[in-house]
Each structure stands twice: as structure tokens, then as C-alpha cells.
């Protein structure tokens, strides 16, 4: 594979990252060699490229070299197929056909998913060669739930790879039985009812796929429900719904058929001609536009959640106005908003909040951009004012009566490329105006009009929203101004009249209300647009006025001015998930992966468990090797079985307590007690799965006391230490208590794989100012940031600096948490490993320059990164490449960071759950270098130019496809394999501060104490927004959230189980004794009346205060009747006369 093309400066940056990693690896390996951990070496393999990630993820030695060889001469999709030739040739040591097929399919899927997600390891359960009814063989691939993370394209191509390899092995095609075909149809529809897939093919399309697909797409059971028809089929192993199978057929082959067809054509594969029929018949009807242009789409309004407001209905007047551009913190599914908009909307849209949008995608992340327009509001005084700064928003917030326009939404060209959405007319703006002849920003309205005489369009600041008005409204306003208005010293006075006020608000003309008059201080363009002279007389143009399609064309004709639409295209939006910046915690939070069973109670307290165990009776150990007098301080728990290779001691610890040697896991058969050898999965004698677990009798009191001594703590001063109830990994390996004590001391928590993580919402950033990230210029210069984006020396905190792709800005809260993690790691090295401290940090700024590991949920590859700053926002800012390397965009996705040394020292595969999906969200490999060719392709569409040419804006007016206009735009894909792929990026819009705006969303504000408060606040905001229909919103909330919840809980109440809160045993019915049969504790209901009735009162409140349909009102009444019939009506207290005195 060709070497990465970089500038010398960027190569030096990469070398610095690798040097820091090498130093950390050396120290971590030295520490791990002491044998304290499950393995005496760092368990996170390092990979510098895609091929290396694939090999590290799957463990097939030699496959990386082959992938590099193939990718040098063909596309990745072709390489994913051709790698099958190497497996068929047994180049990597496979011996059976099943191994060849299994490894080839997993490798191709890893290649297609950038070697990042867990789908290749977890999404394929197994492959099998089975027999058709005619005696021939066919290939069956068993897909599991985690196949979802691969995406539809990789899912579909994995089937194509299976077909390619089975041909090489002379295995025939799958020949389905009729009842199997119908089973697929019914099962996929049932799975869609459970999980709501992205795309559901028609029944006949499913039949077409199954009849013609040469591979049997099978699957493991993933859901709780069983299929109702076509059960107990001979060649289908389960009656339970198989989610993985449904995903591959529907969202894979059904949705991605065109992409499969392209690859079939490239590889000249026969037997897939039926795809043409599938493609011609499965175009989703909802995707087809009725006519050129864009039309209102309310898909984003479905599934409304109570308390999360709607800000703009689809293409509604007063909604978000589309502005074309990319700010330095937008792109990759993130959109910019003026900070004033964020505050005026009651702080619901905090920085990092997700917003569901009408177009061009489904959702976006919210970030501030001060270069775009804010909201236009009516104040309680009657004044109409546009608010463009956060200071003004704070000043006028309490005076706002009505929000007439919620401002602009900045969307980049790349978003239209990524979503394959037609371009659409943007709001007229200064950067467009300048390219159409505007010489400079006008000082005032008179100068703006003088520019028009020179051939320019009217400047956007003086272009009103003419196209929002009808012809009749403009005629009415013109008559009123001509008849009753007066122009004095350049200021227009119009007598108060609600009808006049309404039209002025439609036009969004700023004005005040003074002494009975509407006062317009910038009246010239308004007067001309109304066809009036400077004496407010009707101009001659009125006499020859033709009919018009909209108010803008009428105003242009009356005024003679060149004007464009200030409204542009409105975009609907509602609040999605709130932002997040919080430590990752297990439920309940724990400090150490040490099992204590039920001894620690609900809190899993190890120190309490040690005290409780000291008073346990001998009965707890009856039948064990413990004799009378030995009971004190002991617990019996399930742990891994390990043996010291030197002295033979059997223990549960990773290090032998007798001789200090690292111990080995012991696997044995649970049935015949036969010992297994390393690498064996099943018993060589009886075939049962080998296990590495046993009932261990642990002297918890002694272990706890020894751990306290080892870390220099006393029982009286040590913090509460929390462990786990049990271990769920195959080896059931135990963490040393010392690690837990040090974590508890520093108030940090462990995740299931031994690491300490901090979760944040993802946001993109390509440039930053030192002043906004809380780091001094001197500190930044010390880590390599010596120049600003223009090449000048970095000397001032206000200069703009281009962010390196593997540098990140974490939240301030995260920085403070990582300081504690660093203190823990230093103490761990000193007190457990007997080595020198590594971090020596006291403040968050001390972390600048230190390396971290980024990891996204559902993936298995960490990304090496470096902390260079902090943001006040509850989010993490990083380069688009960094997010794409984790297969994430920034539409509300979140992931985590962990200090590099913590991950290297504490992560172990031995801690991971042995169940399906156990290796997801675990750093099975670490990517050291980001290559734009090897990250998620969405980032290739990020545009990086300082301004869009005029051709792009004119293309927007005619709804051109973005690919037709791409030749005029500089975006990442054009820079790949040049030094410009890493540096020299630019942006069209700037922002003062990437954290400016609300930091915490109102949705999570404790002032809103419950759902009722949240709904009232949501509807109160909706009442003040012109772009929202409050009655419709109330109905949507009831029908999509409140009613389904109440009805579902009412049904669950009658079917509920009962549970012992002490030992967690569940019962279908309460035992006759009323107590738990296992531990004697109380048995309690899991569903209560409050769960059922919690939304009833707020639903009745909404029905009373808003206009709902008869259907919804009746649903509320019927639900109340059902609740009353279940629980009985509340008793009404009879009052007498004395109660009123």
C-alpha cells in the first residue's frame, strides 16, 4: 500500500504521536510483565492502516499483507471479493471448507467496514454447508444482531462474497422450499414490527430475493418473540425471530440492490440478473418528489417525545431559513445556528443537542455560528426586532412576546452530497450578494439603494420577506401607507392598526410602536416595494400592474429594484436527544471487577461484604472444603480457575501469591472434568464446551486488608469500595482489589473491560482559537502549533489555528475527570506495579499534549488522539477525520475517550462478556494513523473552501443535483492522496466562540421537575413560535408518547412479574408465604398504579386547554375509564358545612 502523502510538517506531527505511543507501550508492557493482570503484556494490538486493523481485529496472520497487495491494484469492494481467492488457496492456514468460508466472509466485511465495527466478529454467528432436497450442498450464513453496525452495503456485499467463495469451492446454490420462502416473508414483517427497520421490502420483493439469492441467509434468534406461522421447519433451527437475517435481507439486499449490481458487473458474476427486477420495483414511493423542487416532509415529526419541543413545522413561515455554508465547527451532519436563536428558544437547543430535521438529512448536531442571522421577535412593547447577538438575546429575553422568525440554519454543500438531496434556494445573504456585484457592506439603506443603481441586487439587510405576503396584503399595506402614513426626516410613521401590524410582521420589517404609530426607521426599500414615491403617492407602475404569483415578483415590478428571496427555503426541526458529557458507569457504578455475590447488598459494597462475611454462619459453606472455625471472613463466589505454571498452586488470581509467577487459565469439561488444552473450545472426550470457572471460597476480609496495606490505606480512612455481583467473561478473571481502592480514592469508576471512560457528544471542528479552548499560546506552541491558518506566527489567543486530525477538544468536565484518572494511573504505577508515575498532572491544562484513545459504541477499534484544549460545551470537538475513523458522524452520536495509559494497563479481553456482542465497544485494536481513504466515506464530502462560487448559488435556485455542481466546490475527496488532504482547509463562515450559547439544555434543567412540567414548558414555547401549530403538537405528543405509554403499562400491569429486591429472584405470582423462597426477603410488584396513571392528568390538561380531534379526546376518556375499572375510582370525601369555616 502506498505511503501516506503528507507535508514535512504533518509528518513530524505524526511522528510525535507515534513516539508518544511507543513510550507508553514500553512502560505499559514493563508493568504488565509483573503478572498482576490477566495477560503479562498489553492486549491492544497497534495498527497503522486498514489492513493492519483487519488482521488485528480477526487474528488471521498474514491477511494484512494480502489486503495491501490487493488494494494497490483494485478498489476496496473488489479486494473484498478477491481476498476469497487467497482463503480458498489456504494461504492463511485454514483446513476445512467451513473455515475458508467463515474467514473469507469475515475478512471481506472487516475490509468494507474500515476494520472498525464489531460486525465481522459479532455479526456473523457461523457459516455452515448444508444439503438441498436434490442432494446438492449449499452455503448458509448465520447472521446475528450486531450485523446492524456494518450498514446495509457491507451486509449485502457479505452475501456476494459468500457466493463468490462457494463457487470456488464447488458448492451449489441454495434452493429454498416454498414454506421457507413464506417463513421469510412473515418473519421479516414481524421483526419490523418489533424494531422498525429503515426499509421494509414488499412481500413479493422478499420472495424474489429468497428464490434467487444463491446463499441461504439464516440467523441466530435475537428477539423475545416467536414466529406465529411456518413454525418447526426442518431446515430452520429456531421459531424465534431472527433479527440479523431480517436486517441483511431488508436493509442489505433490499435497500442496497443497486450497489450490489455495480459490484456484480465489475466482477462479471452471473446468477444475479434478478437484481434488475428488484431495483425496478422497489423504489420507495415516499422518496419520489411530486414535481421539481422540494415539498414539506413531516417524517421528522413522527414519534414525538414529550418535553422535547418542536421549533418549526415543515417549510412553515417563520421556521429555520436555510443558509448555504460551512462554519469551522459544522459539516459531517452538524448545522450552525446563531447563539441568539439558541437562547430565545428557551435554551432547549444547547451546544451539542441533537435536532431532528426535515432535510437534507434526518438529524443534525447543534453548534453556534455568529456569522448568520438570529431570530426576529415581537417584544411586549409591540416592537419588532431582529436579535443577532447573545448579549441582545439576554437583554430582550424576558420582553419577547412572539417569535416571528427563528433565524437561519447553516447547512454545508457537503450535507447535500452525502444525502443525495437536491440543492434548494438559500436565504439571500451577503456572501451571495457580493458575488452578484455588491461592492462592500453598505453603511446604510441609502447606500444599499445606490448600489442597486450601479447594477447590484438589493442588499439582504434591506430585503424584506416579500414572498411571504400575498398580492392582496401588499395592496392593502400600500393603500394604508399612502392614505395614512407620513414620512418625516427619513422615518416612516403609520397609524396603529392590527391589520397593518400583521402585514409588517409578515414582511419582518423592523419597527417600534410609539405614541399610536408604527415607526419604521429604514423605510426606503419598503416604500419602493409597495409602489410608492418618496411623497408616499402611488407610483405610475400601479396602472400597468399584471397579476403576480407571489409578493416578491410584485414588489420587484413595483419598485424596479433587483431583489432575491430573503426567505429562501424553510427547514423544519424539533429537538432530539440532549447533549451529554458524563463519566461512563456500569449500573450500579463499581470500582473494581471483583465478584462478591449478594454479600455486598444493593450497593455492591466490598467493605460491607467483608464485615458481613465475618459473621456468616457455617451453613453457607456446608458441603465445601471449609471446616468449622474457618468460616470467618469467607465468601463463596464463581471465579476463574487458574494454575501457577511454576509451583502448581491453583488460585483465582492472575499472579501466584506463593511465588509471584503469572498464572494460566485452566479450562475443563463441566461434565467429565477433562482438562482442555490452550485454544480448545470443546472437550476432546465428550464434546461439551470447556469452561474456566469454579466455585471459589475467598477470604474477602484478608484480601481486603491486604489490598489496603498494599496501597497505603487504612480501613477507617478508605472510601467505600464497590465490586460486582458476578463475572460474565469466559475466563471469569478477577481484578486486583488494589485497583478498585485507588479508583475509589480518586472517585472514578470502571467499565466492564477494565478501562475508565468518559462519554461525550461528537462535534466537528477544523479550526480553533486558543482563547476559546482554555489553553495558552505558549502551551500550544510547545506541542507544535506555531502558526495560524494563514501561516503567520502564533502569538495571540485570538488567531485562528487549523486543527490537526488527531487532536481533540474535550469538555471541561471531561478534563477534570481525566485529571483524576491520571492521578489514579500514577498511583497504580507506583503502588501496584512499583514503577515511576507517568502523568504528574494537577490541572486540566497539564493534560494538553497527552494521548488518549477514542472509541465509539458498537465498534472494536480505538483511535489514537491527543488532547489540545477544552470546551465549555457538553460535547467533544474533534476533526471530521477523527469522528469518521470511529465510523461516526455528528448528528447526535456519542462516544468516549480514555487516557491511553489507562487503556494499555487495564484493558483485557479476559474481562469481556462471553455472550453475543461481548466484544462490541471494546478496544480490540488501536489505530495510530488516520488516512482519509480508510475512514468512513461521509467525511470525503466535507467542503473546505473559503467561499462558494456564484455557480453554486444559481444551481440552488433550479434545484440541481449536488453531484452536477460538485466541480465548482473544493471538498475532501478531491484532496485525497495529496498533502492537502490533511491541511489547508478553509470555511465560509466563522463563529466567535465554539461554546457560545446555552451549555445545558432546558430539557434537563431541574427546574422542570417532571413530565407534566416539561410538556407545559414545551407547549408554552410552541405558543410563542409562529412556525409551530400548538394544537397539532399537543395531539402528536398524546398519540405518539403519552397514550401508548399508558395503554402499554396498563396491559403490563395485568401481566407483571413480582421480584425480590434483595436477591433479584422473579416470580409469576407472589409465593403463599409472601416472602422470597430463596432468601426470605419481601416480594414486591414490578409495576405500580403510578406507572399506569402518570400521564393521565397531563393528557386531560392538554385536552382541556388545546383543540384536539374528537378521536384523541375519546381515547383519553376511554383510557381513563379502563384505568378506573382496573384500580377503582378515588373515593370522594363528603364535606360538610364546617369544612368551609
UniProtKB/Swiss-Prot annotation:
Record carries keyword Zinc-finger? no
Tell me the GO molecular function terms. Answer: DNA binding; DNA-directed DNA polymerase activity; single-stranded DNA 3'-5' DNA exonuclease activity
In this chain, the stretch annotated as Disordered covers: 567-587
**What EC number(s) is this enzyme filed under?**
2.7.7.7, 3.1.11.1
Pfam families linked: PolC_DP2_cat (PF24846), PolC_DP2_central (PF24844), PolC_DP2_N (PF03833)
From which organism does this entry originate?
Methanocorpusculum labreanum (strain ATCC 43576 / DSM 4855 / Z)
Q: What is this protein called?
A: DNA polymerase II large subunit
Reported function:
Possesses two activities: a DNA synthesis (polymerase) and an exonucleolytic activity that degrades single-stranded DNA in the 3'- to 5'-direction. Has a template-primer preference which is characteristic of a replicative DNA polymerase.
What keywords sit in the KW lines? DNA replication, DNA-binding, DNA-directed DNA polymerase, Exonuclease, Hydrolase, Multifunctional enzyme, Nuclease, Nucleotidyltransferase, Transferase
Recorded catalytic activity of this chain's protein? DNA(n) + a 2'-deoxyribonucleoside 5'-triphosphate = DNA(n+1) + diphosphate; Exonucleolytic cleavage in the 3'- to 5'-direction to yield nucleoside 5'-phosphates
Q: Assembly state and interactors?
A: Heterodimer of a large subunit and a small subunit.
Q: Mind listing the GO biological process terms from this record?
A: DNA catabolic process; DNA-templated DNA replication
Stated family: Belongs to the archaeal DNA polymerase II family.
